[in-house]
Amino acid sequence: MVRLPYVTALTTLFSYGLLFAFGQLRDFFRRILDAGKSSNLKGYAPICLGLEDFYTRRLYLRIQDCFGRPIASAPDAWFDVVERYSNDSNKTLHRTTKTSKCLNLGSYNYLGFAAADEYCTPRVIESLKKYSASTCSVRVDGGNTKLHVELEELVARFVGKPAAILFGMGYVTNSAIIPALVGKGGLIISDSLNHNSIVNGARGSGATVRVFQHNNPAHLEEVLREQIAGGQPRTHRPWKKIIVIVEGIYSMEGELCKLPEVIAVCKKYKAYTYLDEAHSIGAVGKTGRGVCELLGVDPADVDIMMGTFTKSFGSCGGYIAASKEIIDHLKHICPAHIYATSMSPPAVQQVISAIKVILGEDGSNRGAKKLAQIRENSNFFRSELQKMGFEVLGDNDSPVMPIMLYNPAKIPAFSRECLRQHVAVVTVAFPATPLLLARARICISASHSREDLIKGLEVISKVGDLVGIKYFPVEHEKTASVEKLKKLQ
């Protein structure tokens, strides 16, 4: 829950108002100066229109260097960030030959599989030699290798479902699967903070879409009751099917889904449950099986389980796990399965090897150690940030921890200063978040050592003081006083 301080809200609104006013003034003078110039686009409607275009030109370009920074190494605990410069006020960014070695607090490398691994990497290289980088075909033609079949069986066993289906891209897994599951005459009830892939999938399905308050099962029940009572628009016939969509860990909030309560509501009103575990599978739970394991939920109670291989497994692609009937149905009608090139064989092998490490089937206990390490690292880092006075969103055990920035001027200030001190962080602003709720999103990895985390905390604390984002310093001062008293005693 975001606790936006009143003064911070006012200063943030004032800052955006100032940027908007100066941007409009610059646009006014530009129109005057360009009035006499000829244009070869006369008569064409402008491609970019509205406030989105204005935001891009007058706000985003000012801080463009804080986003999309190229890297020149594997996204391990430390990586090389390519230095860039601009000679035209950030309109164009040029790469240099220089790199800066930085602590990586931005990648989704939760279990550390993104870098070279003693078990995974040799097998990936061998699969590259045997199968090449691409199948150059779709699954229903010549793109179905035995690796794909093995991974589908392994994923189903890992998450506790009868069957699974693979996709070459995590985003497409949601945006293509949802329209294949529900269409006209159906009802989708979605959490208000669900990922954009879910939003686009729901919009493209043709189903009626309703939203419930973030992570609020009570409001979910209200929406369900209201929609069931009213039925379909205009005809008021009963809904053909109802699907409730939630995430395991919300990627911009770091919060765990209230899954047991959501399932109880869905069972009560005979609605299907769709769980997106992109950020939770492999990252939470004693054996890495996601929020179901962490919260004590039987996977059989979740109708459709979605996940990606881009976070905990160091690869690409995604999966859907469900009953055999649902998976067979998807294999026959889902365009992303029928028409898209199958997942790259080396990427498939990477996931197979990573899951075997997690399960201990590589003959070691490295998987268990990684899971214990990510949990310990996440809880330590979150606790220390809160003690320092930062406003940190999310729950314990979650490796995603947003630090609230709010003010637009603090987005580039925080990002650039952290980079200058060799700590790479991800800053997130509109449209990925609401306009007033800009944040820095920290992602913790099992590959981070305690020394790495302390280094990151020291830099973030210094930059936080410099930028002024310790919005709850009283808590920090109280904690410091208690610790000082304990030491004296």
From Swiss-Prot:
GO terms for molecular function: pyridoxal phosphate binding; serine C-palmitoyltransferase activity. The keyword Signal does not apply. Its main location: endoplasmic reticulum. The modification N6-(pyridoxal phosphate)lysine is found at K311. Keywords: Acyltransferase, Endoplasmic reticulum, Lipid metabolism, Membrane, Pyridoxal phosphate, Sphingolipid metabolism, Transferase, Transmembrane, Transmembrane helix. It is a single-pass membrane protein. The chain crosses the membrane at residues 4-24. Its EC number is 2.3.1.50. It is an enzyme of class 2 (transferase). Heterodimer with LCB1. Component of the serine palmitoyltransferase (SPT) complex, composed of LCB1 and LCB2. Serine palmitoyltransferase (SPT). The heterodimer formed with LCB1 constitutes the catalytic core. This is Long chain base biosynthesis protein 2d.
